[in-house]
């Protein structure tokens, strides 16, 4: 009988330790701003999570966090390239509710264009090709950069 009591006490101690470890791990992820920053592109009702490449917190502008390589092509390779038709409308959903969004398009020939946005929406080009889009958002959290790529057919 005494042995069973010792086993129960050990189980309680182990369970308590595991609970503390799990709560500590969960608390850390809740305080990590990078884990909370999300940007989605919505195409024909489907949502796709963009790649967060850079983050500069508002409260510490000296701190610059780069999650990936500085090569935009390598970052775009992490996104599942979308195939869309010419003129398709894309809508952005950024969970940090930014006050401004700047969209830059990288063309196949290496040139870049600033893309006009209206109501967090852009229209795909009227020319077929491969394009990488970079969204720079500024909001209460700071500045974030998101990447996604498309093939326009």
List the predicted regions and their residue ranges.
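Short beta-strand segments within Ig-like beta-sandwich modules, predominantly Fibronectin type-III
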Residues: 111-118
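Positively charged n-region of N-terminal signal peptides that target proteins for export
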Residues: 1-13
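Conserved structural position at the C-terminal beta-strand
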Residues: 135-137
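Surface-exposed, short loops/turns at beta-strand junctions within beta-sandwich domains
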Residues: 122-131
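C-terminal motif of bacterial Sec signal peptides marking the signal peptidase cleavage site
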Residues: 22-25
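Edge beta-strands of extracellular beta-sandwich domains
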Residues: 143-153
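Bacterial signal peptide processing site
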Residues: 27-29
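Mature extracytoplasmic domains of secretory-pathway proteins
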Residues: 55-110
């Amino acid at each position: 009988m005494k042995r069973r009591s010792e086993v129960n006490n050990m189980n309680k101690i182990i369970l308590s330790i595991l609970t503390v470890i799990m709560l500590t791990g969960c608390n850390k992820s809740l305080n990590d701003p990078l884990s909370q920053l999300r940007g989605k592109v919505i195409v024909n009702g489907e949502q796709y999570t963009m790649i967060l490449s850079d983050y500069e917190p508002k409260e510490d502008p000296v701190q610059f966090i780069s999650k990936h390589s500085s090569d935009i092509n390598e970052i775009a390779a992490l996104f599942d390239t979308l195939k869309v038709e010419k003129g398709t409308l894309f809508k952005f959903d950024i969970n940090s509710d930014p006050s401004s969004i700047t969209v830059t398009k990288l063309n196949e020939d290496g040139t870049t264009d600033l893309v006009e946005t209206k109501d967090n929406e852009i229209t795909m080009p009227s020319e077929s090709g491969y394009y990488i889009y970079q969204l720079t958002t500024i909001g209460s959290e700071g500045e974030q950069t998101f990447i996604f790529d498309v093939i326009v057919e």
